[in-house]
Amino acid sequence: MAAIHSSPRLTLAMDLDRVEALSADLERIAEGREAGELMRALVGLFKARVPHYHWVGIYLLEAGELRLGPFAGAPSPHTRIALGQGICGAAASAGRAIIVPDVNTDERYLACSLTTRSEIVVPMLDGAMVLGEIDVDSDQPNAFNEHDQALLERAASLIAGAVGRAAKPPRWDAPELVGH
């Protein structure tokens, strides 16, 4: 894996150099992995290598609701989310990414953790069809920017491609904690 710059961040949000390094790692990780394995690997990568990502999870769209699959961070009470409900449901309904700089000012926010201050949700798309989404929370306000969005959109694209190649889409009967 490529080394990530260890110099302190000037800003909390992702910078372009870090995005490029992590994007290269995404490509290597995705090569030859089936969809479920890829999802677990990317959740673990983001949680381990991006300090301001304090919770990372992947929701899959099944029968009109988002179901939590692999995640890293504290367990969430929101393992199933209806389309249109919360920030996750809004992103899935719209088929576009949503960045919330301060969850305390967004009435759509479904409280998962008292420490969460900002959130980004990026849908996984197959054309115009939403397959699921990547949800990331931070305990810092204004933690996400367009570089975070670009990185997560690349990950979402890789996952969507793996799901599209799968004979059977991945499915979790219960959320799966990645890492420790």
Predicted regions and their residues:
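Short glycine-/small-residue motifs
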Residues: 132-133
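A short, aliphatic-rich beta-strand micro-motif
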Residues: 118-125
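Short, small/polar residue-rich loop motifs at catalytic or cofactor-binding pockets
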Residues: 53, 116-118
